[in-house]
Amino acid sequence: MGFFDKLFSGVTGGSREPQKPSGVELELRRRLTVFASYEATQDTPLRYFLRWEGQVQGVGFRFTNTNLAQARSLTGWVRNMEDGSVEMEIQGAPANILSHLEALHASYERIGTRFRLVDAQARAPLANEDGFSPQIGRAHV
C-alpha cells in the first residue's frame, strides 16, 4: 500500500513504537524551550537550517512543512536534495518553531513514516523574508 493509500484509508504504521526524536532534535527542542520560556526572548525571531533524513521524499514532506509553517506564521523554505534528504530553513518565534516540530511528527506518526533530524544550525534571521515556500526540484549536495 502506497503513502497516499495509507493516508486516505487511515491505515497506521502497524505495531511500531512511535519514533523518538534524534539527539539533534532533542537538543534543538531544549534550546527552543529555553528561548520560549524567557520573556526577553520569547518573541525574538530565530532562524535554523535543518536537514532531515529517512522517508522524506515522495510523502508530501515539503508541502506538509509548508502548510504547518504557514499556519504558525513562520518563514523560510524547504527543498529536496539529490541524496534523498530534505533541507529547510525556518524562522519565527521559538514557541512556533517548537510547535511546528511537534505537529510535523504528529502528521506522519499515524501512517508510520520514519524520519529524523540529522543537522540543526542556528542562522541569522532575515529581516525582510515573506512567507514559507517549497522549492521545486532537487538541489545538489
Regions found by a protein language model. Give the residues of each.
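Intrinsically disordered, low-complexity, mixed-charge
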Residues: 2-138
